[in-house]
Amino acid sequence: LGTGSNSCYYDGSKIVNNVVSLGYFFGDEGSGAHMGKNFIKDYLLENLPEKLQEKFKKDYNYTRDNILDAVYNLPFPNRFLASFCEFYADNLSDKYIFDLITDSFREFFLNQVEKYKKIREVPLRFTGSVAFYFEPLLHQVSNEFNLKISRIMRSPFSALAEYHKTNKTI
């Protein structure tokens, strides 16, 4: 869970199942892009709580045209949409932000994780900045689904380096 999202079922030696990811436009539930899409839509429609609407406007100073240009005309709109995670972290005590994140995680569990038949037989592992920085909320939502998380890493590269060091391939 980072800019985007994906999942797979790994049996300890290979990936045996992979739920299709529909990308930032139709899917990426639980990701920064998914949260950003929902947040920015509410911002543009002025559906955010008033205090949060004003704080975001003050912090980012984006106009409607700036946002629409970034999403429809500039490269990597998913990265733009995911770029507001720091704002969410800074405003986590706001109920809207808390619900934005936990609802996005719930959608990830429903549309991705719950699709694996034997998912409750294995611990879950997550990689990505969104999973890492919102770890307590991810644990909370996984508990709602009676699922156990065993590891959350900010980046897969540290685990790859650890693997190669242990197996002396570096």
Name the predicted role of every residue range:
Residues 40-170:
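ATP-binding/phosphotransfer module of carbohydrate and carboxylate kinases, centering on a glycine-rich
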